[in-house]
């Protein structure tokens, strides 16, 4: 995620907007793929992984498994959040990433307060993914609008062939 700020800034400065779009797509594909695989690993082997750190406390293992299942299943959203946030920052935008961060905190707090009362610990665990969604929505919209706006810039200069 964080490398996207430098990547986007360098390519923006070079006027190579298509490369920004291509890089974000490739980074998103890699990150989402890895996140989905790790989410599956968390769900299938979560109990075994937790057992490496917790022994003899079945209630701790059970609650940790709930946490891993809920959060691990949504890491792909978090990966997109980081990619969009840092790409926008690299393109010189600060308002939307800041607004998205505020939205993330508010959504997380609201979800924790409401859902914990309704669903207990599982509801509290849902606060993170819902906060990520609340932040990712404005970031993804801003990213798409920004890329559309930047597509009107002059095309990237041709690479000289030596």
Positions of predicted regions on the chain:
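Hydrophobic alpha-helical interface/terminus motif in multipass membrane transporters
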Residues: 8, 49-50, 88, 115, ...
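Residue-level recognition of transmembrane alpha-helices
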Residues: 31, 68-71, 75, 101-102, ...
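Alpha-helical transmembrane segments of multi-pass membrane proteins
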Residues: 58-84
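Short membrane-interface helical motifs at transmembrane helix boundaries
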Residues: 37-58, 65
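Small-residue-rich hydrophobic transmembrane alpha-helices
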Residues: 1-40, 44-46, 78-92, 96-100
């Amino acid at each position: 995620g964080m490398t996207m700020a430098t990547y986007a800034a360098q390519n923006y400065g070079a006027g190579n907007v298509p490369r920004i779009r291509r890089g974000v797509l490739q980074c998103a594909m890699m990150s989402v793929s890895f996140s989905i695989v790790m989410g599956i690993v968390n769900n299938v082997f979560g109990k075994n992984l937790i057992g490496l750190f917790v022994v003899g406390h079945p209630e701790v293992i059970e609650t940790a498994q709930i946490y891993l299942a809920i959060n691990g299943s949504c890491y792909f959203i978090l990966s997109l959040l980081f990619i969009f946030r840092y790409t926008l920052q690299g393109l010189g935008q600060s308002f939307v990433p800041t607004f998205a961060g505020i939205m993330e905190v508010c959504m997380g707090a609201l979800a924790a307060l409401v859902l914990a009362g309704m669903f207990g610990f599982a509801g509290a665990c849902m606060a993170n993914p819902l906060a990520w969604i609340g932040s990712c929505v404005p970031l993804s919209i801003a990213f798409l609008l920004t890329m559309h706006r930047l597509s009107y810039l002059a095309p990237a200069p041709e690479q000289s062939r030596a």
